[in-house]
């Protein structure tokens, strides 16, 4: 069941984006959840992992940026589940998933990539706060045991099955609101 807080956040997001696409994503960092919304209804809810460094916009901060974003690029549509991407290139290797809450030395980007571009000039777009130039993605992870807690280096991590499912439901241009 969606909590009242979620309904208020979703309503404010929909109001702010009423001139955009009907399908939207809201990331609620306080709940470590991602919501897929269409026609004012929550279609799907997924656990996520945002940055262990907290929230922030600055380049090299390793923090998850806040505000309104757009999916600028989608990478990996034909990749097999758990495929490792390095610099957005399919390595043709698959990750061994870690189901325990263990932080490894590897920060593999796996399965799918939805690369985000900030929409708010001076806040998450342009200069030293540009989410796109910071390579902020929604992506799969090898460290599935850490989903639900802050563990990333700025991106939004998801279970591999979930990110593949979400990838099929969104498009380039889908709006993404990231809130603390």
Q: Each PLM stretch: what is its role?
A:
Residues 30-32, 39-41, 51-53, 74-77, ...:
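Solvent-exposed coil/turn segments that connect beta secondary-structure elements
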Residues 43-79:
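Electropositive
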């Amino acid at each position: 069941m969606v909590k009242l807080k979620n309904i208020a956040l979703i309503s404010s997001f929909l109001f702010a984006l009423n001139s955009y696409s009907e399908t939207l994503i809201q990331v609620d960092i306080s709940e470590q959840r991602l919501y897929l919304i269409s026609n004012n209804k929550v279609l799907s809810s997924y656990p996520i992992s945002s940055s262990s460094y907290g929230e922030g916009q600055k380049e090299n901060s390793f923090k998850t940026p806040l505000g309104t974003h757009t999916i600028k690029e989608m990478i990996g549509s034909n990749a097999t589940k758990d495929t490792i991407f390095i610099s957005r290139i399919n390595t043709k290797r698959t990750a061994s998933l870690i189901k325990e809450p263990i932080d490894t030395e590897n920060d593999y980007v796996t399965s799918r990539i939805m690369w985000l571009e900030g929409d708010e000039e001076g806040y998450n777009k342009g200069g030293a706060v540009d989410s796109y130039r910071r390579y902020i993605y929604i992506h799969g992870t090898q460290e599935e045991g850490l989903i639900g807690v802050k563990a990333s280096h700025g991106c939004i991590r998801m279970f591999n099955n979930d990110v593949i499912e979400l990838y099929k439901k969104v498009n380039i241009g889908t709006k993404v609101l990231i809130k603390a």
